[in-house]
Amino acid sequence: MIRFAQYARYPVISRLMKPTVISPFQAQAFSSSSVMLKTLNQTIRNKEKRPEKTNKQSVALEGSPFRRGVCTRVFTVKPKKPNSAVRKVARVRLSTGRSVTAYIPGIGHNAQEHAVVLLRGGRAQDCPGVQYHVVRGVYDIAGVAGRVTSRSKYGVKKPKAA
């Protein structure tokens, strides 16, 4: 005798084992053939597949950690209240064809129109619409000059020991 408790670890089967009540409105009217239900083995074999969760923060990267793009415009924006600054950003046409706005981190940059850049996810929190960061020290964007601390974030090589 099979008990309901044995199928507790299979959520699909446990749902099938529960008694169901079918109202007359759910039954197919004027149907000559009966409704085909799945057998227990078919239910085990074809388990419900849950869709993979996608990262909704960086949609334009299309699942990649980085994307290459070409700068179409380099400009500055002012951040939201209460912050006050002039943030350097670039409008970038990605290799996928999308056009996004990316933040250029660090002090000073050599980004110009038609410069090839590498983008990563990660938004500038106080700039609306800026959802991506330019990776410094890759392609046409140089690393931050004179940077000693946090060099890996700004694309700077280790200085030569004198």
UniProtKB/Swiss-Prot annotation:
Subcellular location: Mitochondrion
Superkingdom, taxonomy of origin: Eukaryota
General function of this protein: Component of the mitochondrial ribosome (mitoribosome), a dedicated translation machinery responsible for the synthesis of mitochondrial genome-encoded proteins, including at least some of the essential transmembrane subunits of the mitochondrial respiratory chain. The mitoribosomes are attached to the mitochondrial inner membrane and translation products are cotranslationally integrated into the membrane. uS12m is required for respiratory growth.
CDD domains: Ribosomal_S12
GO BP of this protein: mitochondrial translation; translation
Cited PANTHER family: 30S RIBOSOMAL PROTEIN S12 FAMILY MEMBER
PROSITE patterns in the cross-refs: RIBOSOMAL_S12
Lineage of origin: Eukaryota, Fungi, Dikarya, Ascomycota, Taphrinomycotina
Gene3D superfamilies, alphabetized: Nucleic acid-binding proteins
Encoding gene (name): mrps12
Protein family membership: Belongs to the universal ribosomal protein uS12 family.
Keyword tags: Mitochondrion, Ribonucleoprotein, Ribosomal protein, Transit peptide
GO cellular component: a single term: mitochondrion
Transit peptide (first-last residue): 1-37
Summary of subunit composition and partner proteins: Component of the mitochondrial small ribosomal subunit (mt-SSU). Mature yeast 74S mitochondrial ribosomes consist of a small (37S) and a large (54S) subunit. The 37S small subunit contains a 15S ribosomal RNA (15S mt-rRNA) and at least 32 different proteins. The 54S large subunit contains a 21S rRNA (21S mt-rRNA) and at least 45 different proteins. uS12m forms part of the decoding center of the mt-SSU.
Protein name, per record: Small ribosomal subunit protein uS12m
SUPFAM superfamilies noted in UniProt: Nucleic acid-binding proteins
A Gene Ontology molecular function term of the record: structural constituent of ribosome
